[in-house]
Design a protein with these regions (language model features):
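Membrane-proximal alpha-helical signals and transmembrane carboxylates
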Residues: 2-362
Length: 362
């Protein structure tokens, strides 16, 4: 019996050796020569709605003993699924392509208008990709173009800078895959930051794309984008230049809080009060402006911004700010009634916006 077992084991080992047995094992790349992909872009393919064009970029890489920087490795493939595109790109590189370090996801506008749920759900199901990946929509263009525009320097560096600036209150809001899926599940809609390539190829912030039922409904830009940030309690990268009778000042928002109070007639939702409190700090001033007048000017400007954003969201019937949930927290006993009525009443709901600003002492 021992001789039979030994013979079987010997045969198995011989089968696995190169040149022995019916087939060889696949050639194993050197794991030291690994391409760590950092950014992924997804667009609709040229082959039609059933095709996806997937682009990945590694960022600048270090090679050799001196760690010389090499240009990013950019690969792309068009297939019917992301997983099949990944497999196809594996064969396009001499390095082992590893997707577990992808932390930036770019979505083309055409794909976003057709639907992004399948792409986001792939990140939630794949073992290598993560829910903490940052998501962006390329406004008026494709993800492949955005990645190629920054190919020399690497798009990863620019996206990481915007993300860091956002955390420091020096850029707009960012969203992760997990946050976006949660908003779509709980609120039926979500906002995602937009990007456009600048004249020198560097990616620039371009407002927010509002996604409803998994598809891009439209864009909030300019004053509407600033209003969205305020209503979301985000301290954005914005300087308000205010004029009063005695002079003016450039002020920055340092803190913001928002309460959302529903108004009922019986069990019928009739209105919503959105109250915003803001703390301001004067960065510079000219003349002799009165603090009270500066606060009043800021309140008027910010009320108009928030109202403009809300009117557009009502037009799309897209509650990407989670106003229903926030109002339900104030009236938990009426949450079921509020949730049932919300999709019907939100487009015509009267929302009263009030802003109270306070100027911090210099």
């Amino acid at each position: 019996m021992k001789k039979v077992l030994a013979a079987a084991l010997c045969g198995a080992v011989m089968f696995l050796l190169p040149g022995c047995g019916g087939e060889r094992l696949p050639y194993a790349r050197e794991m030291g020569d690994m391409a760590l992909m950092r950014t992924m872009g997804v667009d609709t393919g040229e082959g039609g709605a059933e095709q996806l064009h997937v682009t990945v970029s590694s960022g600048r890489r270090a090679r050799g003993l001196q760690g010389e920087a090499e240009p990013p490795l950019v690969l792309s493939a068009e297939r019917e699924s992301i997983s099949s595109a990944f497999l196809a790109m594996q064969g396009l590189s001499d390095s082992y392509v590893f997707y577990g370090h992808v932390d930036q996801l770019l979505l083309g506008e055409e794909l976003s208008r057709r639907g992004i749920l399948e792409t986001l759900q792939y990140f939630s199901q794949d073992q290598e990709l993560g829910m903490g990946t940052q998501v962006w929509i390329v406004r008026g263009g494709t993800a492949a173009e955005a990645i190629s525009a920054e190919q020399e320097r690497g798009v990863e560096s620019r996206l990481s800078t915007i993300q860091t600036d956002s955390e420091m209150g020096m850029a707009g809001m960012t969203r992760t895959v997990g946050e976006t899926l949660t908003s779509l599940m709980e609120d039926g809609s979500a906002y995602l930051p937009g990007l456009v390539p600048g004249e020198d190829g560097a990616l620039l912030e371009a407002g927010y794309g509002v996604v409803k039922d998994g598809m891009l409904a439209g864009w909030l830009t300019g004053e509407q984008a600033r209003g969205l940030e305020l209503a979301a309690e985000q301290v954005g990268a914005d300087i308000l230049e205010l004029e009063t009778r005695g002079g003016g000042a450039a002020v920055r928002v340092t803190a913001v809080s928002v309460s959302c109070v529903p108004e009922f007639s019986g069990e019928r939702l009739t209105g919503l009060e959105l109250a915003c409190r803001r703390s301001l700090r004067a960065e510079e001033s000219w003349g002799e402006p009165e603090p009270a007048e500066l606060c009043a000017a800021a309140e008027e400007r910010e009320t108009a911004r928030i109202s403009a954003a809300l009117e557009q969201l009502k037009g799309w019937n897209a509650d990407c700010l989670g106003l229903a949930r926030r109002a339900g927290q104030m009236e938990s006993a009426r949450w079921n009634a509020l949730r049932a009525q919300w999709p019907e009443v939100f487009p015509e709901l009267e929302i009263q916006v009030t802003v109270q600003a306070s100027l911090l002492a210099a």
